[in-house]
Amino acid sequence: MLIIPAIDLKDGACVRLRQGRMEDSTVFSDDPVSMAAKWVEGGCRRLHLVDLNGAFEGQPVNGEVVTAIAKRYPTLPIQIGGGIRSLDTIEHYVKAGVSYVIIGTKAVKQPEFVAEACKAFPGKVIVGLDAKDGFVATDGWAEVSSVQVIDLAKRFEADGVSAIVYTDIAKDGMMQGCNVPFTKALAEATRIPVIASGGIHNLGDIKALLDAKAPGIVGAITGRAIYEGTLDVAEAQAFCDNYQG
C-alpha cells in the first residue's frame, strides 16, 4: 500500500480544509513546490495534488503550480484532481507530465465522460468519489447526490479506470481515522483498485487499513496528519512495506 501525501492548492498556496469547507482552511505553506520537495525527500512514491479553486470553479486555477511540481519531479507519479471536466484539461495536464487525472464531479453528473477520457488517455484516469453517508457529493462537496458510491463505482469497471480515490467527507481533515469498513466494502465490491482518503491521523489508522485485509486497497492519501506531524511519511511507508498481518 502506498502512502500518498496530499498537497491541496488554494490561491497558489498549500492549505488543508476541514470537511471540504473553503472557509475553514489552514495555510501550511505559500510555496507548494518546496512542500512537494519535502515529501519527495521523505521517500514518498506518489503525490496527490488538488486544485481546490478549480473544484469550485469547474476549471483549473492552480495549473501553473501543478506543472511546476511535475517538471521538478519528472519520474514521480503525480495525480491531480479539482476542476477536471474536459478532455482539453486532461490533455494539458498529461502534456505537463502529470501521471493521472482525477475526475470527480463530472464522473457523477456525466459518467459517460469517464469512458471517453479512458479511451483518449488510457491508464491516466482515476475517478474521485467523495461521499457522505454512502452517497456521492459533487462540486467541491457543496452538493450531495442520491447516487450511492458502490453503485457508481461498479459502473466504471468496464471503462479502464486506473483507481478510485474514495473520500469520506465527514472524516476529511478531522484526523479521527478513516472510514475503514466502507473503504473495505468498496474495495471488495469492485475490481477497480481503491485509494483511501480522509481522516488518517496516525500509524494506527494505516494499520487499520492494512488489517482490513482487502487487497483492493492500494493506497492511502494523507494531508493534515503529515503537516501537523502525527504521521511520518517515511515511517508509514516502511510500515506498509514490512507489514505481515
From Swiss-Prot:
Enzyme Commission code: 5.3.1.16
Pfam families per the record?
A: His_biosynth (PF00977)
Q: Give a yes or no for keyword Nucleotide-binding in this entry.
A: no
| The protein's annotated pathway | Amino-acid biosynthesis; L-histidine biosynthesis; L-histidine from 5-phospho-alpha-D-ribose 1-diphosphate: step 4/9
A single BP term in Gene Ontology: L-tryptophan biosynthetic process
Q: Which InterPro entries match?
A: Aldolase_TIM, His_biosynth, HisA_bact_arch, Isoase_HisA-like, Isoase_HisA-like_bact, RibuloseP-bd_barrel
Annotated catalysed reactions? 1-(5-phospho-beta-D-ribosyl)-5-[(5-phospho-beta-D-ribosylamino)methylideneamino]imidazole-4-carboxamide = 5-[(5-phospho-1-deoxy-D-ribulos-1-ylimino)methylamino]-1-(5-phospho-beta-D-ribosyl)imidazole-4-carboxamide
CDD domains documented for this protein? HisA (cd04732)
Cite a GO CC annotation. Answer: cytoplasm
Q: Key word Nucleotidyltransferase present in the record?
A: no
Report the principal subcellular site: cytoplasm
Q: Where in the cell is it found?
A: Cytoplasm
Q: Which family does it belong to?
A: Belongs to the HisA/HisF family.
Kindly provide the name given to this protein in its UniProt entry. Answer: 1-(5-phosphoribosyl)-5-[(5-phosphoribosylamino)methylideneamino] imidazole-4-carboxamide isomerase
Q: What is the lineage of its organism?
A: Bacteria, Pseudomonadati, Pseudomonadota, Gammaproteobacteria, Pseudomonadales
What gene does the UniProt entry assign to this protein? hisA
